[in-house]
Swiss-Prot record:
CDD domains: DEADc_DDX49, SF2_C_DEAD. One of its GO terms (cellular component) is nucleus. One of its GO terms (biological process) is rRNA processing. A motif (Q motif) lies at residues 4-32. This is Probable ATP-dependent RNA helicase ddx49. The Q motif is unique to and characteristic of the DEAD box family of RNA helicases and controls ATP binding and hydrolysis.
Amino acid sequence: MSDKTFEELGLTTWLVANCKQLGFKAPSNIQANTIPEILKGRDIIASAKTGSGKTASFAIPILNQLSEDPYGVFAVILTPTRELAVQIGEQFNAIGAPMNVNCSVVIGGIDNVTQALILDKRPHIIVATPGRLASHLNNGLKIALKFCKFLVLDEADRLLGEDFELEIASILEHLPPPEKRQTLLFSATMTKNLTKLDSIALNKPFIFEDNSKYDTVDTLKQEYIYMPAPTKDCYLVYILKKHEGSSAIVFVNNCYAVEAVKGMLNKLDIPSVSLHSFLDQKSRLAALKTFKSGKVKVLVATDVASRGLDIPDVQIVINYKLSNSSKDYIHRVGRTARFGRSGRAISFITPHDVSLIKGIEEIIKKQLELYKTDDDEVFRHLKEASTARKIVEIHLDEIEFGVKQKERRTERNELQKQLKEVNNKEKFENNNNDNNNNNKTKTTKPENKKEITKIQEQPSKSTTTTKSIEKKPTTIESKKIDKDIKRKENNFDDGEISLFKKKKITNK
């Protein structure tokens, strides 16, 4: 905490009062440093460790400014995961309750039409994952973003990576230019991505970097167990039974392994829920709700659960499989020992993980302690854990778990690759045009625009086909002929037909 009070940050009276009512005793270090600068109208690049109050650092000043002149879409907040978007939306609603703030969460897994209707009402705050918001914009939904005052990238190091490059670029096209908006970048880790800001174009930003961002809190006990890889399951069962009743998150590296571990634990009477990207949104929210409520004490998850999620009572974090990134370790263990509470993080180390542990110890500037185990007790669970795991994996293979999701992900990656190639081609041609004639302004080649549109509108693989309609010259008569042909064939340019139009044609 800082020595300042919320009153000293220049906030309105109602906001200070509500912060106190919500239990914010004093601003955290990142809040005390960034809120005044945001109120001055400056762009921000800020990083601080997990649990430092980053969300409130941008939510409070945005609501402060919104209360002075409420209108349309005032702020767009982008975040990499659905769960984090929901959580940010909840914080905006809580802090902005006295002014009846209208905050909409726009994420995948929710009905598109329902979201479009909500966005059409111009909420004050839009909290979104890039893919879903870009999809709405690219599909022609007219969201009034031209007067948006704030663009926030939470977990900016992730959002500025290649995974979200095209979606972010698409969203930026619909926002005001950098000089007419404030851009705020927040992250738990400062990476090279945050220094490569050509696409965001910040205006002399205020940069705040918490010197302790890689430090883990003193109340967190960090330990390791060295083991052969095939014995991980029996060690996991041993630890969870030993700490029965404690709330624990088990981090695994892929969706299939998450389901396998969760299924194994449930078969061994250790109630567990899972969280990963292959689950639909309803299942993800249900799993989080069940875990947060304490009905189930074990959450098995991928790194979807490692960033930003505020689950105050997590007592143990288990790294069943270490991430290849040392900084991901910091995000994971940051799920426990929050807000002054104690916690412990236990990492499973195989002979292949020794170099990873050295990298982690170097970045956190402390050595992990050995977690003492009773090996006789551990190996009593070996047979039952192994048997349960095999049964679950056979079932997952029978239902072809994740096959369709992987296919869709492969298609999406291929589409992104094609779009990137088209964009690079466009940039190359524009650069050549500039070199040939410096007096000409940069223009986008029409054929490239058509090519991008064609790629974006490619239908997913389907067994149905549509009849092609021969293009006629663009005269009034030919347009009429085209229209009659389309009605007759019950077909339209994009190969699809709306229910409204279909009904209209049928009635004729």
